[in-house]
Amino acid sequence: MVDTKTPGDKTLTMPTKTLTLKPRVEQGVVRQSFSHGRSKQVVVEKRGKRRLGGDEPAAPAAPEVAKKPAPAPAAPPRQQQSRPAPQQSRSGMVLRTLTEDERTARATALADARVREIEERKQAEIEAQRRAEQEKIEKAEREAAEARRKAEEERHRQEDEAKRKAETEAKKRFGDAEPAKKPAETSTTTTTAAPARPATTTTRTPTPAGRPPAVAAEAGDDDEAPRMIRRPGGPARPAPPPKQPAAKPGASKQRGRLTVVTALNADDVRERSIASFRRRTQRLKGHASNEPKEKLVREVVIPEVIAIQELANRMSERAVDVIRLLMKQGAMHKITDVIDADTAQLIAEELGHTVKRVAASDVEEGLFDVVDDSTDTEPRSPVVTVMGHVDHGKTSLLDALRHANVVSGEAGGITQHIGAYQVTSPESGKKITFIDTPGHAAFTAMRARGAKVTDIVVLVVAADDGVMPQTIEAINHAKAAGVPIIVAINKIDKPDAKPDRVRTDLLQHNVQVESMGGDVVDVEVSAKNKINLDKLLEMIALQAEILELKTNTQRPAEGTVIEAKLDRGRGPVATVLVQRGTLRVGDIIVAGAEMGRVRALISDQGETVQEAGPSVPVEVLGFNGPPEAGDRLAVVENEARARQITDYRAHQKREKSAASVSGMRGSLEQMMTQLKTSGRKEFPLIVKADVQGSLEAILGSLEKLGTDEVAARILHAGVGGISESDVTLAEGFNAVILGFSVRANKEAAAAAKRNGIEIRYYNIIYDLVDDIKKAMSGLLAPTLRETMLGNAQILEIFNISKVGKVAGCRVTDGTVERGANVRLIRDNVVVHEGKLSTLKRFKDEVKEVVAGQECGMAFENYTDMRAGDIIECYRVETIQRSL
């Protein structure tokens, strides 16, 4: 296109002749020669590089371009013709004049282009300067390499010269012919090899037409033999091959269409297989597979004790390395040895791992979560524990509230089991849970357990009896649990009832009732005549409203085992008070060292229920074994977690029992030493009871009976009937079997009768404790008491044949009896203790001599008596002791 740049003419014309561009390409044919006489011709195109500006390399192409008709000189004539005849170019466009904005934009673009050009020129100058510096550095490196090469060649030349001189010297000295032949052969070979080089060079000189010399040289170098270099004054030696850059893995395995590079390198003629390439890679790598691998850093979980093998496995290390580190610390171990957590942590940290310490007790974490009171929105029934002294009417009061008769079912009319019941208040209709506890001294643990799970304590005090020891203990339990107390003064229907005396006695123990100006509620009741029972329930309900008891029934159940027993028909049965959540049939539960799945829930009325909410007492069936009374019950998500917890607790229980047994029994030497020094005797017993609470009370009472001289040794204690294994155990230790509210089965009774094992049955704990106390008292060593009889003074010593020396004495006070024990005192020092063998008055043997009379005395096996000695006569009495 040609712009006339005439303001008046707005037409643009196109030249009629077509413009063409000649491709700047030079073609040639390259002939390639291969082994076995094969050859190949390849067409090679050489494309010229377009040069910008007036560069010098573009000058040779100028003649060719000049031969073509240039469109630039022809343009002015066309423009001149088009001006007078604008009608010929009918296809032209009418152009408008440029506006001011367009001119400004064009000027701005031109200015930007100039600035960009200046910047590019500066950048090119910087690049050229950097390239010049780089070439200078490379040139210096080449010169240094050349100097090193020349020094190396000089050194080799001197070595060869020294070797040749040594060979010449050896030939002169020994005159051998063979050493002379070898240099001749060497020189012949050198001479032959010397002209070989020009021939080879002559062969390589002609190159195919159009092929660059460099390409021909490369092709020739592949087929030629190694070149020999001959220096003046030295033998010919092969020249070192030129250093080539190391080929990258996979570079020799190029496939695809034919290009200039592939044609020159002849890669498409003979290619290496994949297996060959792999073998080459392995050879290049060498022993890279034996290099140390990257170290893995792990988080190692370390329990309280861990075996070395297990520690090595958790760290992914070799056990040998772990043992080596332990040896450096001065400890010799085997792979199966167990080390403590501190040592294991040192080893793991030294090997670069991170350590997470865990304890065996961590399995119990999260079992009893901290209760979030914000979720407790539903009201629950209060739990009321009835406490007081024995025979103050606790169970009778509860029977009157429940309209039941529990007292008649207890042996001896005293409560020996803990019971839980629910009563509906007649006034408000709300349910109240009552827990009945034993009152006598043996059941302290039961009372403490009842106080821990309760909200309110009802302290029952008999109006005719007043405050008693167990009443004081119940007050202390309630204060320790931090629960409010309601005093129920019972038996006000008796004629000798004194309620005011009870209130006054309670003041001594910091229990101040409302009538005395305090804040403790007191109610006068009569369980026998059912007086003021509704008022007692009303006070309990009022106290419960003040406490604002709330719960969340949707959370997993938690509770406390109040009582546990082994029922012959139903298996292990536990009385559980649910404290939080809801316990349902099918839940997996854990209590102490026992676990199980809830098979059935039985209410206090004997009815089977499907679930039990908060503050509801139920009997739970489904435990693997009877749990301990007082254990906390929890619902877990699966059997694996339950088994993990119970295994840990059972292990702890075994360790504790083993420690107590070993501490009590010790080794054989310790037992013998103990018998020699203290003479402590043991009374072996096997105790079986109906429920866990009674067993606990019996064991506590028997433990209190022990003294420094005699103690009860409990070989086995359990819940359930007496079995044949119990009899076998008793036979081995010659023990007595005690059954409390249980009986022996047929096989156990027959085995006991056959082996002579005594089995005693009891229904009242007092009788059991009294009998054991008497039996243990029989093991006590009796007490020896000395009773003075009289004194006698020796007047004269007589020698009598066939008898020996006889002392003539006068009894000064008391009496002297034959056969009694005597002491011989000389100068207020006892010189002999023995027995009186002879007592005569005149010539007759007498039984005793009274004060003021004279007699003759002789001692058993002692004759050194002198006149003036004092004889003291006394009698030793044996008195049986009791606990």
From Swiss-Prot:
GTP binds at residues 388-395, 436-440, 490-493. Residues 235-244 have a biased composition (Pro residues). Residues 10-22, 77-89, 185-218 have a biased composition (Low complexity). One of its GO terms (cellular component) is cytosol. GO terms for molecular function: GTP binding; GTPase activity; guanosine tetraphosphate binding; translation initiation factor activity. The keyword GTP-binding applies. Gene3D superfamilies: P-loop containing nucleotide triphosphate hydrolases, Translation factors, Translation initiation factor IF- 2, domain 3. It is found in: Cytoplasm. Keywords: Cytoplasm, GTP-binding, Initiation factor, Nucleotide-binding, Protein biosynthesis. Residues 436-439 are annotated as: G3. Residues 1-259 are annotated as: Disordered. Residues 413-417 are annotated as: G2. Residues 379-548 form the tr-type G domain. It comes from the Bacteria. Residues 490-493 are annotated as: G4. Coiled coil: none annotated. Residues 113-184 have a biased composition (Basic and acidic residues). InterPro entries: EF-G-like_DII (IPR053905), EFTu-like_2 (IPR004161), IF2_assoc_dom_bac (IPR013575), IF2_II (IPR044145), IF2_N (IPR006847), P-loop_NTPase (IPR027417), Small_GTP-bd (IPR005225), T_Tr_GTP-bd_dom (IPR000795). Residues 526-528 are annotated as: G5. Residues 388-395 are annotated as: G1. Pfam families: EF-G_D2, GTP_EFTU, GTP_EFTU_D2, IF-2, IF2_assoc, IF2_N. NCBIfam families: IF-2 (TIGR00487), small_GTP (TIGR00231). One of the essential components for the initiation of protein synthesis. Protects formylmethionyl-tRNA from spontaneous hydrolysis and promotes its binding to the 30S ribosomal subunits. Also involved in the hydrolysis of GTP during the formation of the 70S ribosomal complex. Belongs to the TRAFAC class translation factor GTPase superfamily. Classic translation factor GTPase family. IF-2 subfamily. This is Translation initiation factor IF-2. The gene is infB.
